[in-house]
Amino acid sequence: MSDDNKQDFKKGISNSFVWFLMAAFLFALMVQNFIDTKFAKVSFSYQLEHLVNLQLLQPEDSRKIALNDNLVTFSGKFRDRLTEEGKTRYKYLELLDTNHELKAEQARVKDEIKTLKTKVFDSASLFLQLSGLSIPKGGYVVVDDMYNTPEEDQSVVIKDLPKSAVESLVSLEKEYEAARQNPTAESLKNLGNLINELLRNLRSPALGIGSETIKQSLKGIDKEVADSGATSLSEQLAAYGHALVNLKAIIDELNHEEDHIRLAKLRSVRNYKETLDEYNQINTRLDDNQIQLDKARQSVSNVIWYFNNQELSTKALEKQDPEVYNQWFSKAKEEWANFSHNRGGIFRAPDQPLNAVLEKTFKSEEPSPNYFSYLFTLLPVLLVILVLYMLFARQMKGMGNTAMNFGKSPARLLNKGDNKITFKDVAGVDEALEELQEIVEFLKNPQKFTSLGGKIPKGVLCIGPPGTGKTLIAKAVAGEADRPFFSISGSDFVEMFVGVGASRIRDLFEQAKKAAPCIIFMDEIDAVGRHRGVGMGGGHDEREQTLNQLLVEMDGFDTNEGVILMAATNRPDVLDKALLRPGRFDRRVIIGLPDIKGRYDILKVHARRIKMDPSIDLMAIARSTPGSSGADLANILNESALLAARKGRTAVTAQETIEARDKVLYGKERRSLEIDENEKRTTAYHESGHTVVGLIVKSGDPVDKVTIIPRGMSLGATMFLPKKNRVSYWKQELHDQLAVLMGGRVAEEIFVGDVSSGAQQDIERATQLARSMVCKWGMSDKLGAVAYDERSEGGGQYGFGDHHEKTYSDETAQAIDSEVRRILDEALAIARKIILDYKEQVELLTLMLIEFETLDSEDIQEIVVKNNWDAVRKRERLKRAADLHKKEAATPPPPPPREVDISSSGTIPNTLGLSS
């Protein structure tokens, strides 16, 4: 009987109810623990500087546990109330910050006064010229010396006037008297023109009358003079006389002295007086602040402050950079304001870097295991796992066959406001942005186009090499229009299940129609848009079914629904023709590699977030990176920032940008490659030959640098800086370029007495260039302007590349070979003559390359052209470049006592400054 009762009791209580009781009990324990303890907001070690400086912590409760040499876990407790010493310290810091702000404001206003004073001189001089007033012996005083300060002369006195042809009121009065005695139509017409000219000058911005009453008076006089032109001579004369009387009254009103200032109704004078008043107010506030600061300084004269991981005296704290101090004080102000919340609270911060505050003020202790805290740490995780298990178990019971839900589109959606990229973040592709501006206008205001019966392009295909910003432009279009943006890759439609790709296409367009107007961006569309009928499955493979569905969706949805498909590819030649026809992708935007201006604009965009030295010339970087994409340029600046950080600099210098450019474009330096002295000397002669010939030829590009440091697959390199965008080649330029290519081989022959295989690439490039001159560009006098290089476009149905067909006779082939040989021999002769003429410079350049390994354009000019080379000056330049923006080494801690107990810590303090 008892067993039956037990079974009935078990049946009455479900497992879910038991789990609920356990979870409720554990949750109650957690809540009780959190209610009894007040936690403070301290998470980082840099906060401790302000907490210790302002005496917000109880020193006896401040402890740290060392995890390793650099990381600690610290804990502590806030005081229950502020100390008087802490209030005094905060008052001093606040006064010092205010002092910095007032001094900066004083300097700004002082500069503004200088600018306004010049404007007052100009407007007052123009007034004297227009009024005809004579300058007194002591000068015409605009602003009295009452506004002078012991340091600055703020008065404005005009002692002479510049020569000018403007008519004055005095001269007009004389003209009026002459016309009144003998009034004629000609004299009155001349008088009216002079009065109009005077009115224009008085109403001009150069004089700048700021009184609205005077402006209206001048406007009325102008109208009166204009209306009198159609009246009789006597009426004209009377109107002109009345106008001159009114102008005289206006001149007297402007010349009236008020509060030791004349011309107070001119904007320049009024602004000058207001700025003077502001300057005096700032000086008064600064004097009051200085008195309070001097008094507060006496109370904290013996305090040692923790400032950005340094220990500073009060005197040293006041010498810190005001901007750095302001940022530091803002954190202290925040901690001071948060004390009301943190009062009496405890805190604990794990895995924080060790700093001076932790080292000096926090007590060290050994970590003690707290198994009860482990339980509360793991308890939330266990509860989350339990809840997730119950949710998934319930879902799996009702899912059935819908578990394999592969037909949904995996497109990622950026809603309005999430996409912060606009056209301001895109540079170097101005033509592409102009093409896409119409798309943005449609997304912002569709009715503007549809009301007139116009149709917006249904599809936009962005074509360009990798890294030119196709995806970025698509995001910018969505961000500029502030519309939803669906992004997906062409490979996302390819799956192992039949029909998944077509299903995802349908689902993608359904989602897009619900969010219209919007943009669908399909990256690498060639993954699904290739020519049909060439796959492994004939016309029935999965990719072609996906393409067919895409074609139907593009041709099926209406433009008024506001769904625009943008796609990107760098292989437009493999796309299906049906995909490219008008009505689908009916607008193609070519995004090519940027030119010099484009590269410069791209560099400016990426340089915004990098702290760079002002001496860096972004245009020089743009000029030295022909053929680079936007991604390459961004990588160059990122590499330069990493190099600067590795060298311990506070800002990126020109040296890092050059190293980063060479690393990205030519490969990383291989300094570990073992090269004997003979090989190094031969490489130096080889590169010196290239350099000297490149400098001497008439049409060569300037030499940027020469190096014998192995990089990539080469043992050395001579780098040139193009003067302009290369859109075409001239015959003389090509001959000079061939001579430069032959310069390295000629230098080896002359100075080494032998030739090496290092000139292999030079000979290949020279031969290819000479053959192009003969066969493609018609630059051979013997063979004439005939193209012998017949190219057949491949890459069609079977994907074969381009191939060349020989369409000329064997005799012509021999003539081509002999002409190519002649051009190369001429280039060899030119290079040999230049090397022999500049033999001494080649020798010196070789020696300096062996010593310094790399020479820049300034060094090369001094050696080859100017003949004023100084190796000492070169070493000084290298030292200055190495020390530029170097971080100051931290002050080492004081040495420990002579007897050190290492039994507790297990380590010996590092007193020699050696890195561990």
Swiss-Prot record:
The protein's Enzyme Commission number: 3.4.24.-
Query: Per the record, what is one GO cellular component?
Result: plasma membrane
Instruction: Output the NCBIfam families linked to this UniProt entry.
Output: FtsH_fam (TIGR01241)
The subunit field of the Swiss-Prot or TrEMBL record says:
Homohexamer.
Q: Periplasmic face: residue ranges?
A: 38-371
Q: Where is the composition biased (Polar residues)?
A: 902-916
User: What does the record give as cofactor?
Assistant: Zn(2+)
EC class, as a word, reads hydrolase
> Per the UniProt entry, what species is this protein from, by scientific name?
Protochlamydia amoebophila (strain UWE25)
Q: How is the cofactor bound?
A: Binds 1 zinc ion per subunit.
Q: What are its GO biological-process terms?
A: protein catabolic process; proteolysis
- Note down the stretches annotated as region Disordered: 883-916
Protein name (record): ATP-dependent zinc metalloprotease FtsH
The UniProt entry, under SUPFAM superfamilies, shows: FtsH protease domain-like, P-loop containing nucleoside triphosphate hydrolases
Enumerate the residues binding Zn(2+).
686, 690, 762
Gene (UniProt): ftsH
